[in-house]
Amino acid sequence: MSQFDVAIMDYWSTSGRSFLHRAGPAAKVLMAAGFVAAVVTTRNVALLAAIYVTCVALLAVARVPPLKVMGIASYPAFFALLFVISEWDGTWQTPALIFGRALAAATSLVTLLATTPYPRVFGLLSRFLPHIVGEALFLTYKSVFMLLDMAGNLVTATRVRSGLQLRHPLTNLRNLSLATGKLLIHAFDRSEREYDIMVVRGYRGQIAAPERIWQGLASDALPVALGAAALAAAIIIRWNP
């Protein structure tokens, strides 16, 4: 996930006017939590597919481009491939379960962040978590993707300048060390600018929690019901196969 992906999700979450955008942050967090808990609990591929399809359908109704979101949510599938290689037992169910869990969990969280501005999400979490934990989660969310994007740009620039060559490993190490040092300098500079921007926007050492975490039964009932239904189905299938 690049910084562009984070920025476009911020745009979707703040510009949308659908029923899912209007729902309270607490309802959508509970929905995502229910989906993720169901993903962790179940070993049923059909239920994982149902959760994935439900998220895609919600995004389509919310007028968030589902294909773009599916692309963003597919990043964990590359990491899941490593588990497939190590855990494969010769059946199709094992890779389907691993990939299904990765895609369903990622799509659940992307659905939350694509329909809820992230300051409201982390502001809600700060009500229930220690102050330092909430702040750390908020800043980590922003900084990790920025650093990954910057690192990718530096590696690309180094390759274009013939700084990485298979026949010259020592030269590669030297160039990578220089690129890493440049990345650290840029990271410190970017962190200072981000802090200044947050101060201008009203940050005073604490993320402001949203005044209303619920928007009423009409707006919040469906997200909560979907999360609860997914978790209930996972529990029933797990203990009553």
Task: Briefly describe each language-model feature range.
Residues 52-59, 76:
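Hydrophobic transmembrane alpha-helices of multi-pass, membrane-embedded glycosylation machinery
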Residues 70-170:
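Juxtamembrane/interface alpha-helical elements of multi-pass membrane proteins
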Residues 28, 47-48, 67-69, 134-136:
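Alpha-helical transmembrane segments and their helix-entry boundary regions
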Residues 41-42, 59-64, 115-117, 235-237:
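Structural signal for the C-terminal ends of transmembrane alpha-helices
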Residues 43, 62-63, 90, 130, ...:
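Short helix-capping/hinge motifs at transmembrane helix termini and TM-loop junctions
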Residues 21-25, 45, 65-72, 91, ...:
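Hydrophobic, aromatic-rich alpha-helical transmembrane segments
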Residues 33-37, 56-60, 84-88, 106-111, ...:
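Alpha-helical transmembrane segments of multipass membrane proteins
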Residues 1-45, 51-55, 153-241:
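Transmembrane alpha-helix interface motif
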